[in-house]
Amino acid sequence: MFNKLMEVLMSFNLPRIRNKSELQHHTNKQSYVDDVFNNFFNEIASFSYPTHYNNKILSPRTDITENESEYHLEVELPGVTQDNIDLKIDSNILTIDGKKEQSTEKKDHNYHMKERYYGSFSRSISLPSNVDEEHVTANFKDGILSIKIPKKEQSKAKKIKIS
């Protein structure tokens, strides 16, 4: 647990003190350390569950709507290419897997902030029993994966004659 915390701490660009004047607004070294940790925990709190910063597992944001004939999902995948998306449906579980490739990191630049995520992502969504798994369609445009899942025709109750 401690190692994971240290790994997360090291992944942030903590402020570096270059000279004593940078500490003037702090009353002592402890107030500087308090500020560093407060900033760290505020940044951690800003991440929404289930996104995990240290291993960069992402869960794309999704809107799900329905009408009389189908379910419609819109999944935000900014910066992801269509070739890096895998979509499957099995036993009424829709799974979206993929990878967001990292652009070349600038070795000769010092980052002041680095908020963009890279790496693998996965999202599984349980679907109702009335979906037609054989006729699912998907389209990817402008960073939005649009998935249409038709509903099966509901079987109508038949009256049974009792003899």
From Swiss-Prot:
All copies of domain sHSP, residue ranges: 53-163
UniProt key word Disulfide bond: no
Coiled coil (UniProt feature): none
Pfam families the record matches: HSP20 (PF00011)
Keywords, ordered alphabetically: Plasmid, Stress response
Gene3D superfamilies hit by this protein: 2.60.40.790
InterPro entries: A-crystallin/Hsp20_dom, CS_dom, HSP20-like_chaperone, Small_HSP
The keyword Transmembrane belongs to this UniProt entry's keyword annotation: no
Family label: Belongs to the small heat shock protein (HSP20) family.
Record protein name field: Small heat shock protein C4
Gene name for this UniProt entry: hspc4-1
